[in-house]
From Swiss-Prot:
This is Protein translocase subunit SecA. GO terms for molecular function: ATP binding; metal ion binding; protein-exporting ATPase activity. ATP binds at Q87, G105, E106, G107, K108, T109, D531. The keyword Lyase does not apply. Residues 895-906 have a biased composition (Basic and acidic residues). Signal peptide: none annotated. Its EC number is 7.4.2.8. It is found in: Cell inner membrane; Cytoplasm. Monomer and homodimer. Part of the essential Sec protein translocation apparatus which comprises SecA, SecYEG and auxiliary proteins SecDF-YajC and YidC. Its main location: membrane.
C-alpha cells in the first residue's frame, strides 16, 4: 500500500526516467529551426565540428542534443522521415546503455540511427546487431542514405556460407550498382566493413569473427576493432532466446586417417634399446609413459619417412616444417609400445574402448587425446575416426559483455527485465507510444481437443476473410503451420505460409500481409523486423515502377493503396490468431504486437486446447475438471479470465526454468571465460609484439629451473642428486648434451647454484648458435610461430578437457560436494597445468627445432595458416524448447529417441550441477 502511494505521488521509476529525458527533447527541438536553415553541405559539416569538439574534451552527453537534432534533420531531408519525440527518448535510452522497449511499428530501425550517429563520432565504431542477414543488408542500405548524408561510412557483415570470410561483407556506396548484386552495397573485405563508422550484422557473425580473430596468426588477419558500442535489435531474441547455446568453431582433431596408417607402418621397423647407452632406436620410460628416440633412432626414422615420401631429401625430423610429423611419430610410438590390447583397451565392434586402469571397467564414450586414440585405431586395423574438436567457443552472454557499452531495443522486454538486469546489467525502459494503442486483446478460447480448436480457427479465418479483414495466424512450430495450411487448402482459402527459413521472401510476404482479406500463417520468428502495413506496403509497390516512374503512375498506385488502407481500417485492422500459447509470455506479446501499430485498429485472440503442450503439461487437469463441471459439449469453448491467469502462471514456470538453464550455463562459462580472456590477451600481445626473445629467455630459465629442481632439489646434498636422470632429460627434451657427471668429478667446489647457472649458460649459448646460423630476424619469426602453435594446440586440448570435466561434474553431488565449486577448483588447477605445459613445450621445441634458412620459417607459417583454416565448422545450435522439439531440417527422417543416460530420479542430484535434489530444482516443473 505504501509502495502504491509513493508511486502515485512520484510516479514509477520508468515514468521518472522518461520525464527526465523529456527535458532533453525540448533542447533538441529548439535546434530544429537553425538546422533547417542550413544547406546539405553545411549540415554534413556539423559531423566534423562535433568530432572536433569530442576530441577537444567535450563528452558525448554534452554533444547529444545537437547530434540528435542533426540526425533528425538528415532523416527528414533524405528519407522524408522525421524522428518523433518518443523516438528521441528511445535514442537517449540506447545511448545510456539501456534497453528501449518500443511497440511494433514505432520505428526502432530509425531510433537506432540517433545513438549510432552520436557514438560513431568517436571513430571507435558502432555495431548494430540484427537477427538475420537479410535485415542487416536491408537496414544498412535503408539507413545508409541518412548516414552517408552526414559523412559517415556504413559496413555490412553477412554469413559467408562457407565461401570464405571476405565473401559476404559490404560498404554502403550510393554510386555502386551491380547486376544481380545488392543495391548500393559494394563488396569489400571484412576488415574494411569493420573499419566503417557503423557496421550492421548478425549476432552469430559478430561472435564468430571475434573467435576467428583470436585464432589469427598475423595482426593483419584480424578483422574486428576494439568492441566499443553495440545496439542489439530484437534484444530479447538474441540475448535471451539464443543465449542457451554457445557459439562454437570446431574442426577435425588431428590429421586424416592416411597419416596415422603410414606412421603405423613405420614404427614396427624401429627396435628398442635394451640397456642405457646400448644400441637401439628408442628408449622407454614406463613410469612417465613416454618413449624417446635415440640419435640412431632419429636417423633411422628420418630415412624411413623419406622412403615413404613423408620427408624430402635433406629435411630432418626436427626441422621447423616437420613438427606435425614428429607429433604423429610420438603418438604411433606410444600406441605400439606403451598401450596394450586387453590391458589398456579392448577392441569391440570395430571400436577401441578404454579400460579404466583403477577399476578395470570400460570407459564408454571416452577417447585419448593428442592423436593417441587414432594411432591405436591404426595399430589394431579398425576404422580411424576423425574427431571434431572445439577450436574456440563463447556464449552470447560473455561475448556481448565484452562491449564497452551495450544497449538494445525490442517490442517485448519488460517481462524479462529481471534477467536483463541480472545477467547483462541492462535496465529496461518502456517508451510511450507515439499514438495511443487501440488494439483489442480478447480472452483466450479453450477447447477440449486440438481438432475442435483447429475447426474454430478455420471458422474464424473464414469469417475475417468474408468481411475482407487481413489475418495473421501465429504458430509455435513448422509442423502446426503446415497442418493448418492443409486445412485451409481443403477449405479453399488462399493463404501464404512463412516458416522462418527464407528471410528475404518472408519480408516481402509480410509487407503484403495487411492487404484486405489476406491470410498469412507464420511461426513466431518468421518475418520479424518487418512491419505489417494496413493495405499492404506502399513503398514496395512504388519500387515496382522503376527508377524514374511517371507522376501519373505514382498517383495511381498511391490512390489504390489509400483505398485498400481505408477499407482495412473500416474492417477492424489486422486480426491476430494465436494457434497456441508459446512457452514465454514475451513471444505471445510479440505476436499480438504485429497488430495495432502506430494507433491503428486491430485485434488478437488465442485459441487453445487441453491437448496443447503447455496446457497438457501444466494446466489441463484443473481446467478439464472445470469444463466438465460446466457440462461443456464438443465444439464449445471456455472463455474465462481465471483460465488465462492459470496459463500465464504456467508460462512463468517455463520462463523461470529457461532462466535457470541460461544462468547455470553462464555460471559455468564464466569460469572458462576468465581463462579465455587470459589466453586471448596473451595471444593478442604476441601478435602485436615484434620481438618476444626477452620473454622467451625468462620462460626458458623458468622451465629449466623447474626441470633441474626435479633432479637436484634445492638445498640438497650431492648424494641426493639424480645426475644421470638430469643429463638424460636435458638431452631428450632440450637437445642439450652436457657432461654434468664429468664436471662434478673434475671440480670439487662445483656447488648447486653454480651448476644451475652453468646449465642456463650452456642453454643460452646453444640457442645463440642457432640464432647466428639463420639470423635474428628469422629466429624472431620462428619464435612467434612456435609460441602461437603451441599455445593454440594446448588451448584446444584444454577446451576438450574442460568439456569432459563439465559433463561429469554433476555427479559430484552424490558425494555431497558442490559441483560448481568443484568445477571452479579443478578448472583452475587444469589452467595452471596448461600454462606450465605451454612454457615447457615452447622451450623444448625452440631448443630442438632445426632452422636452416628463412624459407623454413615461411614453411612453418604456411603450415600454421593451412591448419588453422582447414575444415572449420561454425555452430550455433537452436535452444531446445520445453514444449517443442527442434524443427527437423528438410528431407531429414525423424529418428526414435534413445536414452543415452539413466533417467534422473526425483531424489537424485539435479543434472544442472546445482547440488540440489532434482525435485527441488528443475524437477519442480
Amino acid at each position: 500500500m505504501v509502495t502504491s502511494l509513493v508511486r502515485k505521488i512520484f510516479g514509477s521509476r520508468n515514468e521518472r526516467i522518461v520525464k527526465r529525458l523529456g527535458k532533453t527533447v525540448a533542447r533538441i527541438n529548439e535546434l530544429e529551426a537553425e538546422l533547417q536553415s542550413l544547406d546539405d553541405e553545411a549540415l554534413k559539416a556539423r559531423t566534423g565540428q562535433l568530432r572536433e569538439r569530442l576530441a577537444g574534451g567535450e563528452s558525448l552527453e554534452a554533444l547529444l542534443p545537437e547530434a540528435f537534432a542533426v540526425t533528425r534533420e538528415a532523416g527528414r531531408r533524405v528519407m522524408g522521415m522525421r524522428h518523433f519525440d518518443v523516438q528521441l527518448i528511445g535514442g537517449m535510452v540506447l545511448d545510456s546503455g539501456r534497453i528501449a522497449e518500443m511497440r511494433t511499428g514505432e520505428g526502432k530501425t530509425l531510433v537506432a540511427t540517433l545513438a549510432a550517429y552520436l557514438n560513431a563520432l568517436s571513430g571507435k565504431g558502432v555495431h548494430v546487431v540484427t537477427v538475420n542477414d537479410y535485415l542487416a543488408r536491408r537496414d544498412a542500405a535503408w539507413m545508409g542514405r541518412l548516414y552517408h548524408a552526414l559523412g559517415l561510412s556504413v559496413g555490412v557483415i553477412n554469413s559467408s556460407g562457407g565461401a570464405g570470410p571476405d565473401s559476404a561483407s559490404y560498404l554502403y556506396d550510393p554510386g555502386f550498382h551491380a547486376e544481380g548484386g545488392i543495391a548500393h552495397l559494394r563488396p569489400v573485405t571484412r576488415r574494411e566493413a569493420y573499419a566503417a563508422d557503423i557496421t550492421y550484422g548478425t549476432n552469430n557473425e559478430f561472435g564468430f569473427d571475434y573467435l576467428r580473430d583470436n585464432m589469427a596468426f598475423r595482426l593483419e588477419d584480424r578483422v574486428q576493432r576494439e568492441l566499443n558500442f553495440a545496439i542489439v535489435d530484437e534484444v530479447d531474441s538474441i540475448l535471451i532466446d539464443e543465449a542457451r547455446t554457445p557459439l562454437i568453431i570446431s574442426g577435425p582433431a588431428g590429421e586424416s586417417a592416411e597419416m596415422y596408417e603410414r606412421m603405423n607402418r613405420i614404427v614396427p621397423k624401429l627396435t628398442p634399446q635394451e640397456e642405457e647407452e646400448g644400441p637401439g632406436d628408442y628408449s622407454v620410460d614406463e613410469k612417465m609413459k613416454q618413449v624417446f628416440l635415440t640419435e640412431d633412432g632419429q636417423e633411422k626414422a628420418e630415412q624411413l619417412m623419406r622412403d615413404a615420401g613423408l620427408l624430402a631429401e635433406g629435411q630432418g625430423l626436427y626441422d621447423a616444417g616437420s613438427i606435425a610429423l614428429l607429433h604423429h611419430l610420438n603418438a604411433a610410438l606410444r600406441a605400439h609400445i606403451l598401450f596394450h590390447k586387453d590391458v589398456d583397451y579392448l577392441v569391440r565392434d570395430g571400436q577401441i574402448l578404454i579400460i579404466d586402469e583403477f577399476t578395470g571397467r570400460i570407459m564408454a564414450g571416452r577417447r585419448w587425446s593428442e592423436g593417441l586414440h587414432q594411432a591405436i585405431e591404426a595399430k589394431e586395423g579398425v576404422p580411424i575416426q576423425r574427431e571434431n574438436q572445439t577450436l574456440a567457443s563463447i556464449t552470447f552472454q560473455n561475448y556481448f559483455r565484452l562491449y564497452e557499452k551495450l544497449s538494445g531495443m525490442t517490442g517485448t522486454a519488460d517481462t524479462e527485465a529481471y534477467e536483463f538486469q541480472q545477467i547483462y546489467g541492462l535496465e529496461v525502459v518502456v517508451i510511450p507510444t507515439n499514438r495511443p494503442m487501440v488494439r483489442n486483446d480478447m480472452q483466450d478460447l479453450v477447447y477440449m481437443t486440438q481438432k475442435e480448436k483447429f475447426e474454430a480457427i478455420i471458422k474464424e479465418i473464414k469469417y475475417c476473410q468474408e468481411k475482407r479483414q487481413p489475418v495473421l495466424v501465429g504458430t509455435a512450430s513448422v509442423e502446426t503451420s503446415e497442418y493448418l495450411s492443409g486445412l485451409l487448402k481443403k477449405a479453399k482459402i488462399a493463404h501464404e505460409v512463412l516458416n522462418a527459413k527464407q528471410h528475404e521472401r518472408e519480408a516481402h510476404v509480410v509487407e503484403q500481409a495487411g492487404r484486405p482479406g489476406a491470410v498469412t500463417l507464420a511461426t513466431n520468428m518468421a518475418g520479424r523486423g518487418t512491419d505489417i502495413v494496413l493495405g499492404g506496403s506502399l513503398e514496395a509497390e512504388l519500387a515496382t515502377l522503376g527508377d524514374n516512374p511517371k507522376p501519373a503512375d505514382v498517383d495511381r498506385v498511391k490512390a489504390d493503396w489509400q483505398k485498400r488502407h481505408d477499407e482495412v481500417l473500416a474492417n477492424g485492422g489486422l486480426h491476430i490468431i494465436g494457434s497456441e500459447r508459446h512457452e514465454s509470455r514475451r513471444i505471445d506479446n510479440q505476436l499480438r504486437g504485429r497488430a495495432g501499430r502506430q494507433g491503428d485498429p486491430g485485434s488478437s485472440r488465442f485459441f487453445l486446447s487441453l491437448e496443447d503442450n503447455l496446457m497438457r503439461i501444466f494446466a489441463s487437469d484443473r481446467v478439464k475438471s472445470l469444463m466438465q463441471r460446466l457440462g461443456m459439449q464438443e465444439g464449445e469453448a471456455i472463455e474465462n479470465a481465471w483460465v488465462t491467469k492459470a496459463i500465464e502462471n504456467a508460462q512463468r514456470k517455463v520462463e523461470a526454468h529457461n532462466f535457470d538453464i541460461r544462468k547455470n550455463l553462464l555460471e559455468y562459462d564464466d569460469v572458462a571465460n576468465d581463462q579465455r580472456k587470459v589466453v586471448y590477451e596473451q595471444r593478442r600481445e604476441l601478435l602485436e609484439t615484434e620481438d618476444i626473445s626477452e620473454t622467451l629467455e625468462a620462460v626458458r630459465r623458468d622451465v629449466l629451473e623447474g626441470v633441474i629442481s626435479q633432479y637436484i632439489p634445492q638445498g640438497s646434498i650431492e648424494e641426493q642428486w639424480d645426475v644421470p636422470g638430469l643429463t638424460h632429460v636435458l638431452e631428450q627434451d632440450f637437445g642439450l648434451v652436457l657432461d654434468i657427471a664429468g664436471w662434478l668429478e673434475r671440480e670439487d667446489d662445483l656447488h648447486e647454484e653454480t651448476l644451475r647457472e652453468r646449465i642456463h649458460q650452456h642453454a643460452a649459448e646453444a640457442y645463440q648458435v642457432k640464432e647466428d646460423k639463420v639470423g635474428a630476424e628469422t629466429m624472431r619469426r620462428i619464435e612467434k610461430d612456435v609460441m602461437l602453435q603451441v599455445l593454440d594446440s594446448h588451448w584446444k586440448e584444454h577446451l576438450a578437457a574442460m568439456d569432459y570435466l563439465r559433463q561429469g561434474i554433476g555427479l559430484r553431488g552424490y558425494a555431497q560436494r558442490n559441483p560448481k565449486q568443484e568445477y571452479k577448483r579443478e578448472a583452475f588447477e587444469m589452467f595452471e597445468a596448461l600454462l606450465t605445459r605451454i612454457k615447457h613445450d615452447v622451450t623444448a621445441l625452440l631448443m630442438r627445432v632445426q632452422v636452416r634458412s628463412p624459407e623454413d620459417a615461411e614453411a612453418l607459417e604456411r603450415q600454421q595458416r593451412a591448419a588453422a583454416g582447414a575444415d572449420m565448422r561454425f555452430q550455433h545450435s537452436q535452444p531446445e524448447s520445453v514444449l517443442h522439439k527442434p524443427e527437423a531440417g528438410e528431407g531429414e527422417e525423424a529418428q526414435p529417441f534413445r536414452r543415452e543416460t539413466p533417467k534422473v530420479g526425483r531424489n537424485d542430484p539435479c543434472w544442472c550441477g546445482s547440488g540440489k535434489k532434482f525435485k527441488h530444482c528443475h524437477g519442480k516443473l
